[in-house]
């Protein structure tokens, strides 16, 4: 799994909130950058800094739960990666951390699932089957991505430039061996 965080405050889920969520979720986020000259010890990286983690499926789930606990709506999180990279696994974990108690399933055929949480609604979208970004209108894209909610978007590249500013992109990939995912935190 590769994880990237970035964006601006324009969507309400801006950089400070995204960084705070990543710091709380990652636990080791501050290990990803070399401290500047004259600075003692590790520092929390700016969103433009890069870092990688290799996580097992269980570690990915634990990381996702911590991320969900730290997340604050409104927040749009995109989950990109090949089939089987762990997008739905991570979405399930984020939802658990956010307080969703019902089973979270892949919205591949329904395209969007809505879940209730004591902290507010969660929308989980899977854009894999979209053939044209104009189809987003049929999903209520503008309403969902501007709602005071946690929004998880799988296959965000199908949104072709329609992602809100300030979203948190997380890219997932298989690492060496099938048991691990790579995490990349970058701006």
Which residue ranges define each predicted feature?
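P-loop (Walker A) phosphate-binding loop of NTP-binding proteins
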Residues: 82
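Hydrophobic anchor at the beta1->P-loop junction of P-loop NTPases
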Residues: 77-79
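Short phosphate-coordinating micro-motif centered on Lys-Gly-acidic
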Residues: 2-5, 14-18, 22, 26-32, ...
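Short beta-strand-centered segment that lines the nucleotide-binding/catalytic pocket of NTP-utilizing
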Residues: 100-115
